[in-house]
Amino acid sequence: QVGGNWCPWCLRFADFVEKDTAVNKAVNDNFVYLHVNYNPRKKEGDASVEKAAQLMKRLNYPQRFGFPVFVVLDENGNVLHIQDSSFLEQGKGYDEQKTLRFLKNWTPKAVK
């Protein structure tokens, strides 16, 4: 998950994964789930800005979809899919069935 602690929707998704039993199980059983705290507002000259730019390039610029954005990598670190989170939303939160469908479609078993 690429986003940041400045992003309400990023925090909502992290909370959703933690509290929704089915989603939590799907994530923990099939993925190494990492949070990338990306801050597009940081100023040039900050050492973390260059590192963040390099990471976003390596991940095929997922920030173009907004935040949060989900990047699925294979076991070698190659980008398989970038998911815009808006397709998983419902109201002021996230939809369990849409999220489970997304996760199921990108499990290691599904992509082999």
Go through each PLM region and give its residues:
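N-terminal post-signal-peptidase region of extra-cytosolic proteins
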Residues: 19, 52-57
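Extracytoplasmic/secreted cell-surface and envelope-processing proteins
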Residues: 8-10, 43-45, 80-82
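Chalcogenol-based redox active-site neighborhoods
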Residues: 15, 41-43, 59-61
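Non-catalytic, surface beta->alpha helical segment in thiol-disulfide oxidoreductase systems
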Residues: 58, 64-111
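Typically the conserved alpha-helix immediately C-terminal to a functionally engaged Cys/Sec
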Residues: 11-26
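Thiol-based oxidoreductase modules, predominantly thioredoxin-like and allied folds used
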Residues: 24-50
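Short pre-active-site segment immediately N-terminal to redox-active cysteine/selenocysteine motifs
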Residues: 3-6
